[in-house]
Amino acid sequence: TSNMLHQAGKIRDLSQVDKYCDWLENLEYDTLKLPRPNKVIFLDVPVEVSMRLAHERAGLKANTQKDIHEQNPEHLLHAYNSGKYMCQKYGWTRISCVENGNLRSIEDIANDVYNSVKQDINNYENNN
C-alpha cells in the first residue's frame, strides 16, 4: 500500500493512477498471491507538518540524511494527495494526526487506530 501511494504520486493523470493501481493490485494479490489487507489506515499528516517535523528531527541528529522522498517536497505533496485519493478509492481509514497545525499525541492517535480496528472487529462479530 505504501508502494502504491508513492508510485501513484509520480503519476499526474488520474485515469493513469487508476490504471496503475489496478495493475499493482492484480500483480500483488492475484499473480503473486500476497495477502490482501483487511484494513488500511492512512495516518494523515499534511506535508507542511511532516516536513517541519523532519527538519526538527534532522536538527537533533547531526548526521541525519533524508531519504530520496524526503528530499523532494513536490513528491511528498503528490504522494500525500495520492494517499487521500486512495482513502476514497479503496475505503482506507483516514486518521488525522494533526490538530491546529500540531501533531496530536501518540496516545490520541493510537486510541483512534484502536477504536477503528475495534469497530471493524465488532462489526465482523455481529455479522457472523
Segment roles from a protein language model:
Residues N3-N81:
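A glycine- and Lys/Arg-enriched "phosphate-lid" helix/loop adjacent to the NTP-binding pocket
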Residues T1-S2, W92:
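Tryptophan-centric aromatic hotspots in well-structured domains and transmembrane helices
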Residues E48-N128:
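NTP-dependent small-molecule kinase module
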Residues S2-L5, G101-L103:
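Short, active-site-adjacent cap segments at secondary-structure transitions
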